From Swiss-Prot:
Name recorded for this polypeptide: Maestro heat-like repeat-containing protein family member 7
Known glycosylation sites: N200, N210, N255, N267, N296, N541, N546
Keyword match Lipid metabolism: no
Keywords: Glycoprotein, Membrane, Phosphoprotein, Repeat, Transmembrane, Transmembrane helix
Source taxonomy: Eukaryota, Metazoa, Chordata, Craniata, Vertebrata
Length: 1122
């Protein structure tokens, strides 16, 4: 079985498709930034000024040859005019075979880039090729092509020990278009340019070509030789081929003999090899990497062979013979993750101690003809190239393993590179490690599987923080003046590598979600207090937008991802004190507008020319005005109206708030004022023109304002941040109030200021409507229909408390003072023992080791009641409750009604002007609500019977209500009804009717708690004193004695003594004649009392000697008559 090299595959560019950008830097196709040459290419001459570092991805678009912002005309000058020996074509061949183990698999062109024909094209010579030109036209091969190109072919191959399973194409090497156009020296023998250029190689290019897959473990004949052309880049040997002999001939072929019988020893011989890699099949294996340095080697130095073996295949008698090779690179999976050091070792030294090595890097001199700039960077290039090769070899190419293993390998490598980036210092830039790691990550992005959104965000955050946090170039150069030039070069290389990584990540997942995961980590850096950090962030954002416009692989019907935040942050930067930042931000907005306009026109199936569209939009949005950047802000906001929905308006407002955060003290006063002005203009204009679109997102806007206020301390900035509240409340009062009710409780200074903003700033809302909304919320139960606790009433009470602190609001509150007072008193009763959802706001001044005071909702509600009384001028009433302990009683379940009665009694005593209004409001409240509602209303109502105005109330609402209360199932309602009747009995016209109700009142005391009995009996004494002589029926007294008797043994001493005292007084009220029934009842009540006396209760005898004496005499009289 042999692989013939006679078949050629010709690659050409499809002009009908949008090519996929490579991983090199994208020039400012739509920006004013001049493309910088990539300094990482050490073996190719630098291009002339303006030569594209990325393909023009639209027939009408190409990089600006003058470095000017925006698309450029199609007539681009030939790069060869600069003197660079740039080839006009290149031919790439792949081997062809009839064996079933060789699988030519055409891969789809993912991004419309260099697309090979779907079928291999036989070629008897190397004269057929396609010309890659800026005009994307196909031309015949010219005569002036260098001979090295006309006679040199490159094989593209991939191995797979299991051809039946699709492969993720891990680490298939390729040449980017830039390398094909610029780096013609890669085809020369003894060239030192590696086939895989880490800084400008796009791994996804090979996905569109035919891939040769060779399964060396499927040979039927053990003696059959498998011939691989030197142009097959990768050949994987599965662990079934445990005995193999590798060698290379002068013709550049690799002969492999497979033995179907596995054995523990593996002997490998490699001669004239430029690149040999032994990749372990498990974490305990070793990696062997060889690089040729012989100038006159007959084998192309760009060839590569890879052995994949499981750890079980390695044994003590395994041997590896490598000849005509200068340097070996050895690494171990197990050790590499712990130690990233790289050491070199000449091949002549002893190779037996592999475990002591983790990597050997081949250092090579630059070839003749290399440019001076490339020579200056050769040292860093060598480090980078070999680091890249090392990481490549660490990644296993085991195609016969499960996809889960492949996923873990990529994840491990990504984490390794991220850790390497994190280890780099943030205050200096003296090592290319940061840049190299990002370039390796960029190439990893072309492998499967793609990163998840979370992983991509973490990766971007890590890289962006490492680069953006660096000091300014000037600061780093001043710190180390001797390396100023090196720092300058390395700095630009690092920024370029970061941009390449961002672009590569976008190509990895060219979806709205993928773009969002890249843009979101960049956004906050645009609001940095340091100029150089803002400049880097704006530049990166604009570059990503530029790249998106050129590529534009997706269409979003619902709008651009994170449009509001991105637009808002760029708008703020238009007003940046640094004019260059402002200018670039406006250019980024123009690109963003063009993307949105392009998608809109694409949806309408319109013919589009990106170049013309961009230029039109640039004129449409106007030039940058450094003297008055706010004019640019206003213009942009006005013109973006077609693309702003509710979510975008919300994000715009929140982005404006980000610009108000406390800025570094190093910023001058003028700079701070400029940035605050930009935020204010942005907020005001958005609210003025698009506030009607924010209706459905008002809760999110209010929450965002609350969160941002914690980071804004400057008074003027806080005023600006609170503007949306008053603006939105003037049009959407209900929605704003409902949103504010969701603020964490208890209200901190930020939440309180948001409530006050409703009436402090213009345009202010209607205070009358505001108070009515709060009153409505206060009338709700703090329990939902599903039985869950609701925070709305307590939040409404808190908001009312803050509004009462504004003097201008007090007069408006008086209008609904009675309703507010009654609603608050009822809410106090509802909140007793209520556990609300966990929405307690953390206190700024609370330390970690100090627990904040426990937030008790009922106490907060009582505080609001007290505040309302004081603001309404009821200071005497408040003081009265303070003296009587009423405020404490109000928060307790068993005594809440007593505190309400005390308050009503105090208001009557001090002649509160609002009592009549309260009286008439209470009448309908007595019929509504549940038990707590009725108890609170009744407790206040009965005390108002002391007023003269009660005569105006119909009897059915006074006396009739009290009579109904005597039969109520709640004992408290019975006690309150008795109190009401007693108060009514003080009026002569009511005395007779109340006297007739005395038996019912006494009877209602049965089976009642001793404390309530004491309270009711205390009220009944008034009636007994006034009507004692008129009562001839002793049955009422006997009923009272029967009621008091069970409480003689009450555990509470106050209850016992009070009932016995009352008992003695009732006995004295008895009158002759006595009936048999009365004597029996009297005897039954006196006997337990005598037992108490006999037990020698000194306290009882001491407190009530007269009552006991009277009762004893009466008892003797009864016995004598019997």
């Amino acid at each position: 079985m042999a692989l013939s090299r006679g078949t050629s595959l010709i690659l050409h560019e499809d002009p009908e498709k949008t090519p996929s950008p490579n991983s090199c830097e994208v020039p400012g196709i739509m920006s004013n930034t001049t493309p910088r040459p990539t300094p990482d290419l050490t073996l190719a001459p630098l291009p002339a000024h303006g030569v594209a570092l990325a393909p023009a991805l639209h027939p009408a678009l190409s990089p600006d040859p003058e470095g000017v912002s925006g698309p450029v005309p199609n007539d681009i000058s030939n790069p060869n005019a600069s003197g660079a020996a740039t080839p006009s074509s290149i031919q790439i061949n792949t081997a062809d075979t009839d064996d079933q183990s060789l699988d030519h698999t055409p891969k789809p062109n993912l991004a419309g880039t260099l697309c090979p024909d779907s079928q291999p094209v036989p070629s008897l010579s190397s004269t057929q090729a396609t010309v890659l030109s800026p005009e994307n036209s196909i031309k015949p091969l010219s005569e002036d092509i260098p001979k090295s190109f006309s006679s040199k072919v490159f094989g593209l191959g991939q191995s797979n020990s299991n051809p039946s399973r699709p492969e993720p194409n891990l680490y298939i090497r390729a040449l980017s278009r830039e390398a094909l156009v610029r780096s013609h020296t890669i085809s020369r023998q003894s060239s030192q340019t590696p086939l895989l250029l880490p800084s400008n190689t796009s791994l996804d290019r090979l996905h569109s070509g035919n891939i040769s897959k060779v399964n060396l473990g499927r040979a039927q004949n053990s003696n059959e030789a498998i011939t691989l052309t030197s142009h097959t880049i990768f050949a994987s040997v599965s662990k079934e081929a445990l005995s193999a002999s590798w060698n290379t001939g002068s013709k550049g072929s690799v002969n492999v003999t497979s033995n179907s019988q596995p054995r523990s020893g593996l002997n490998v011989t490699v001669t004239h090899a430029s690149h040999v890699s032994l990749i372990p099949g498990s974490s305990e294996g070793l990696s062997l990497h060889s690089s040729a340095q012989v100038p006159n080697s007959t084998l192309s130095p760009s060839s590569c062979m890879t052995l994949i073996m499981g750890s079980e295949s390695l044994s003590m008698d395994s041997s590896f013979v490598v000849t005509d090779t200068s340097t070996l690179t050895l690494s171990s999976h197990r050790d590499y993750s712990e130690d990233n050091s790289i050491r070199t070792m000449p091949l002549e030294e002893n190779l037996g101690k592999w475990d002591s090595l983790q990597g050997v890097t081949a250092f090579r001199s630059p070839p003749e003809g290399t440019s001076e700039d490339a020579k200056a960077n050769e040292s860093e290039k060598r480090d980078h190239d070999n680091d890249t090769a090392l990481v490549e070899n660490i990644i296993s190419y085991q195609k016969n393993q499960d996809e889960v293993e492949v996923t873990g390998e990529k994840e491990t490598t990504v984490k390794m590179m991220m850790r390497k980036i994190q280890e780099e210092p943030l205050d200096s830039l003296l090592s290319p490690a940061r840049r190299q790691a990002m370039e390796i990550l960029a190439q990893l992005s072309h492998t499967k599987p793609i990163l998840s959104v979370r992983e991509r965000v973490e990766l971007v955050n890590t890289c962006v923080r490492s680069v953006f946090s660096l000091p300014s170039v000037q600061a780093m150069q001043e710190k180390d003046e001797s390396k100023a030039e090196v720092i300058q070069t390395l700095y630009h290389q690092t920024l370029d590598s970061l941009q390449k990584l961002l672009n590569a990540l976008f190509i990895e997942d060219p979806t709205p979600a993928g773009l969002k995961s890249i843009l979101e980590p960049l956004g906050p850096w645009m609001n940095s207090g340091k100029v150089h950090e803002r400049a880097r962030a704006v530049n990166s954002n604009v570059s990503v937008l530029n790249y998106t416009l050129v590529t534009l692989p997706f269409f979003v019907s619902s709008g651009f991802p994170t449009l509001g935040l991105l637009l808002g942050r760029l708008l703020l930067r238009i007003g940046d004190p640094d004019e260059e930042i402002g200018r670039e931000a406006l250019d980024g907005i123009t690109i963003l507008y063009t993307i949105l306009d392009l998608q809109k026109r694409t949806k309408n199936k319109e013919e589009i020319n990106k170049k013309e569209l961009y230029e039109t939009n640039k004129r449409f949005l106007g030039p940058y005005n450094p003297a008055s950047p706010c004019q640019n802000i206003l213009r942009v906001i006005a013109e973006f109206g077609d693309f702003l929905g509710p979510q975008q308006v919300r994000d715009l407002l929140l982005a404006a708030l980000e610009g108000l955060k406390d800025i570094s003290e190093t910023q001058g006063k003028d700079s701070i004022e400029m940035m605050q002005l930009a935020s204010e203009v942005m907020l005001s204009s958005v609210l003025e023109w698009y506030r009607h679109r924010a209706l459905e997102v008002i809760p999110e806007i209010m929450q965002g304002i609350y969160m941002q206020l914690s980071h804004i301390q400057e008074p003027r900035a806080r005023e600006v941040a609170l503007l949306p509240i008053s603006f939105l409340a003037s049009s959407f009062m209900t929605e704003v109030v409902v949103a504010l009710l969701m603020c964490p409780l208890p209200l901190d200074s930020n939440g309180a200021e948001m409530w006050r903003q409703l009436i402090l700033r213009k345009p202010s809302c209607d205070v009358r409507d505001l108070l009515d909304l709060l009153l409505t919320s206060l009338k709700e139960k703090p329990v939902t229909k599903k039985g869950r606790a609701s925070i709305v009433p307590l939040a409404a009470a808190s908001g009312l408390c803050e509004l009462l602190s504004v003097n201008s609001c007090v007069g408006r509150v008086r209008r609904i003072y009675p309703q507010l007072l009654l609603a608050l008193l009822i809410q106090v009763h509802y909140h007793i023992g209520l556990n609300l959802p966990s929405r307690v706001a953390p206190r700024k001044d609370s330390k970690d080791d100090i627990q904040p005071p426990l937030f008790v909702p009922v106490r907060w509600m009582v505080k609001v009641v007290k505040t309302l009384l004081l603001k309404m001028g009821c200071s005497y009433e408040s003081a009265f409750l303070e003296e009587q302990g009423g405020w404490e009683l109000m928060g307790q379940a068993e005594s809440h009604y007593r505190a309400v009665s005390l308050l009503a009694r105090a208001m009557v005593h001090y002649s509160c002007q609002e009592l009549c209004r309260i009286l008439y409001l209470l009448i309908p409240l007595l019929e509504r609500g549940d038990e707590r509602h009725k108890i609170t209303a009744t407790a206040f109502f009965v005390e108002l019977f002391r007023m003269e105005q009660v005569r105006r109330i119909p009897e059915e609402y006074s006396l009739g209500r009290m009579v109904e209360g005597l039969s109520h199932r709640d004992p408290i309602m019975k006690v309150l009804s008795i109190r009401g009747l007693v108060i009514l009995a003080r009026r002569s016209e009511k005395m007779t009717k109340v006297q007739g109700l005395l038996p019912s009142m006494v009877k209602s005391l049965k089976n009642m708690d001793g404390v309530l009995v004491m309270e009711a009996v205390h009220d009944l004494k008034t009636i007994f004193k006034g009507q004692a002589k008129k009562l001839t029926d002793n049955s009422v007294y006997i009923e009272m004695l029967q009621t008091l008797l069970p409480h003689f043994i009450d555990a509470r001493e106050t209850v016992r003594t009070s009932c016995i005292n009352t008992y003695g007084k009732v006995v004295k009220k008895l009158r002759m004649p006595r009936t048999q029934a009365m004597e029996e009842q009297l005897t039954s009540t006196l006997m337990p009392l005598l037992f108490i006396i006999q037990e020698g209760n000194a306290k009882v005898s001491q407190h009530f000697p007269l009552e006991f004496h009277t009762a004893g005499i009466f008892f003797l009289l009864v016995c004598r008559n019997v």
